[in-house]
Amino acid sequence: MKKLLKSVLVFAALSSASSLQALPVGNPAEPSLMIDGILWEGFGGDPCDPCTTWCDAISMRVGYYGDFVFDRVLKTDVNKEFQMGAEPTTSDTAGLSNDPTTNVARPNPAYGKHMQDAEMFTNAAYMALNIWDRFDVFCTLGATTGYLKGNSASFNLVGLFGTKTQSTNFNTAKLVPNTALNQAVVELYTDTTFAWSVGARAALWECGCATLGASFQYAQSKPKVEELNVLCDASEFTINKPKGYVGAEFPLDITAGTEAATGTKDASIDYHEWQASLALSYRLNMFTPYIGVKWSRVSFDADTIRIAQPKLAEAVLDVTTLNPTIAGKGSVVASGSENELADTMQIVSLQLNKMKSRKSCGIAVGTTIVDADKYAVTVETRLIDERAAHVNAQFRF
């Protein structure tokens, strides 16, 4: 049985090095691996001894914490219906029969959409308070940066198409978007911002060189969106440090997207994650491979901020945006005609929807290398609910 356990854990640890995979599981034996310190010797007394003091029971460890999520499995967390203008019909041939001025409930194209890519990279300082070489209470303080990419439907990219309102009356018409642009890609990069986490880990059961342990962790960060890219044929644009409207319904203010826009706020993403895990390790001299399972819930909430396409407040060369014409079977009409704006996408906007975990359970495999019972380096890979890699280097005082 011991040989089988050794084989399984060694294979898992070696496999973790061959594939790259926000919160690590960590080695369940970590509280008891470093039993000596660089400044103070470890204490191996009996906790029930009346002569033992808390000074004998407590020790400190510090080190580096690096966590690199290459693909977090996320989906949108939105309502089934979305409020916007009525959809154009086959009877709207030379422009809309009636320009949309009121919102109607339509099926939400963002409902249940999966994100194509979600990355997060964290570098932090690691501090742990150890009790009786069995329990750890720890925290991390550092910085994180992220990247999100998905189909434009996940971000409710919409615009107005086919309007018959002339440009001279457009600013006062209070029209709402009627077309969902679902065949495009939206990506965003966040800035590098402060991140922190807290947690606890306990070695619950030991038998020879095997250790069964559990941990609980919570992490939080609130990065701002540094750059937003919309890759769409009908309306392609990039915004550095985007701003938008929180809680605003259509129609947005006609100044939305211009430098004169008011009532906007910086686009930021509130990241929260909870995680509980159970893991088993087996010590083989300097190496302690382990394998674990975890349950986690993560959310990315940007307050459903609505961001408008950048545009000019006043037309220059008869245009306010660089959106192309979409002639289709018709033709591009001259300025001053009834449907002069019908062939270009107007009042384009998107919103940053709330996202959450698509899968809650995952596995982690890794190994810890201990030197002189004072220093340790842990390498870990996580799979199923995310592809992530983790590195932790620490020493005991």
UniProtKB/Swiss-Prot annotation:
InterPro entries attached to this UniProt entry: Major_OMP_Chlamydia (IPR000604)
Keywords: Cell outer membrane, Cell shape, Disulfide bond, Ion transport, Membrane, Porin, Signal, Transmembrane, Transmembrane beta strand, Transport
Membrane topology label: Multi-pass membrane protein
Coiled coil: none
Gene Ontology terms for molecular function: porin activity; structural molecule activity
One BP annotation, GO: monoatomic ion transport
Keyword Methyltransferase tagged: no
A family per Pfam: Chlam_OMP
Signal peptide positions (record): 1-22
Subcellular location: Cell outer membrane
Organism domain of life: Bacteria
Gene Ontology cellular-component terms listed: cell outer membrane; pore complex
Keyword Transport: yes
Main location (coarse class): membrane
Subunit structure: Part of a disulfide cross-linked outer membrane complex (COMC) composed of the major outer membrane porin (MOMP), the small cysteine-rich protein (OmcA) and the large cysteine-rich periplasmic protein (OmcB).
Family (UniProt): Belongs to the chlamydial porin (CP) (TC 1.B.2) family.
Function description: In elementary bodies (EBs, the infectious stage, which is able to survive outside the host cell) provides the structural integrity of the outer envelope through disulfide cross-links with the small cysteine-rich protein and the large cysteine-rich periplasmic protein. It has been described in publications as the Sarkosyl-insoluble COMC (Chlamydia outer membrane complex), and serves as the functional equivalent of peptidoglycan.
Protein name: Major outer membrane porin, serovar L3
Name of encoding gene: ompA
